[in-house]
Amino acid sequence: MSAQEQGINEVPTCHGGLENLDAEHDYWIDDIEGSLPSDLVGTFVRNGPGRQRIGNKPYGHWFDGDGMLSQFTFSGSQVHFRNRYIRTPKYIEETSEQKILYRGFGTQIPGGFLKNMFRFPANPANTSIVYHGSKFLALNEGGRPWEVEPGSLDTVGEYDYEGSLKGKSFSAHGKV
């Protein structure tokens, strides 16, 4: 029986703490113990790696996991949850092929050193989320921001500040 079949995470840097969440969800949370403050109204969104393997092949480092947004919307006494993967080329193509196709921070594509040597790591858009310049942006240090729609969390696409962002990287750890 494989480690995955036993429920063991094969990525040594994860120490068993991170597992895939393959499904996207959209539902009202019914099971709340106690009550929520009536003036708790708003939305909290977080970003993080939602997938640590593709098919049976684990990524080499948890930094390479595909970005997943998790959104909690509070409306007085109710909470709604929605999660969505950010549809980067890496996510779309690896999901379709069910194999690793992009080099990452700690993940090599098949083919050895020469195949990986001049390839920059893919941008999994998995580090943070900010609202800046009227845009909701998913960030990663290894690439440009990815714009997503507030509320639906649908991916709009890579955002380059209307051509003014010339580089291929962007800080994902902004301070306010």
Map each language-model feature to its residues.
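Beta-propeller domains
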Residues: 1-176
